[in-house]
Amino acid sequence: ILDALDRAIAAGTAGNIAESGRLVSEADASLRGESGLGTLIDNIALVSGLVSRVDQLDVLASGAEAQLESESGLSTREVERRSNELIALRDATWSLRNDRLRTAKAVGELAGKDASASARNAYLSIQQAFSALDRMEVRGRDSAGVHVLVWGHGLDATDKRVAPLLAGRLDDTLFTNGSVRVGAGSRAWSFVYKAAAEIGELGDNTRAMRTTVSN
């Protein structure tokens, strides 16, 4: 992945923005989903290398954009082609920084240290839901909630190590934030997380829910 980004930087430096964007897009695609999360999580060296290269690519794209704006005598078709190449490069680098790296960091914070791969994958689904809620909030929502269904966990609600963690959460008739329901035979459990920051900043609701989930 880092090699692909190094080649993307070299291509962009040589003026081949299209090739640079293609290579960054391929690197971004390789880090999507559960397999990408497994590659990034707790891999400090890789994450540091990615951040450094994405920073370089952003500078490269800004320089190419400034050069395009300063050039005169270009045909409309040429301007359009080069603009589209820059957009593709910027989109790919933005996705690496704000989708892949940000998601891996958020999942790590939700799941905690030493979480299993299956647990991290489950938290990835929760993080994806939170990201969707963040986008919805921009459109004016002032409350949000997530209902999480977990099965195949092998836990027993009556276990003396588990029961204290469920105290006060099983009998909430209003199903408020933090409530839990245990299905027949303890096979499936449902957890609810809710927040309503009617007066506040964008992201307040998901920040509150992330704190509840991680605790």
Go through each PLM region and give its residues.
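N-terminal segments that mediate ammonia production and transfer
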Residues: I1-N215
